Amino acid sequence: TEKNESFPCEIFGITTITDNENLTNSSKTALRQLLTDCLTKTNLKIENIQGIKVHGVGGNSDEMEQSVLQELFPNTETILVKPYMGHTLGASGALETTFLIEHLQKTDVKRGHFLNYFLGFGGSNIAWILKVGE
């Protein structure tokens, strides 16, 4: 039998914004604000983030996302989930966070902070930090 080891993690610093600039594609301004607001709310700095679970739908907004991430987090690893799961619309936050936790359990990561963000239709955007370890 396989031994189940504890993998403590928590979601904190949940931040939401509404992007009024474009209801179907997110703007650079809104994404930048979402990510920086999340860091501010959690009192974390850019260098405290070990990885970022990107939205990455395979569409027009991917280039914009990469531009903002390169500007704010030039040396932080990105984790892309949607190519493996598809676009799950309203369930993406729960499913992609579960997928990320499963991924991290299979790596040598025992602790750290991982930024997750989701860009929804109608400009509803949310971000949070997944804290792994105690």
Regions from the PLM with identified roles:
Residues 60-75:
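Active-site-proximal gating segment of KS-fold condensing enzymes and close homologs
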Residues 1-6, 88-110, 128-130:
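Active-site-proximal alpha-helical scaffold in enzymes
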Residues 12-24, 48-58, 76-93, 111-121:
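Cysteine-centered functional microenvironments
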Residues 28, 32, 66, 90-97:
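Short alpha-helical patches at coil-to-helix transitions and adjacent helical residues
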Residues 1-51, 122, 131-134:
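Condensing-enzyme catalytic core mediating Claisen C-C bond formation in acyl metabolism
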Residues 71-77, 105-109, 134:
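Terminal domain-initiation and capping elements
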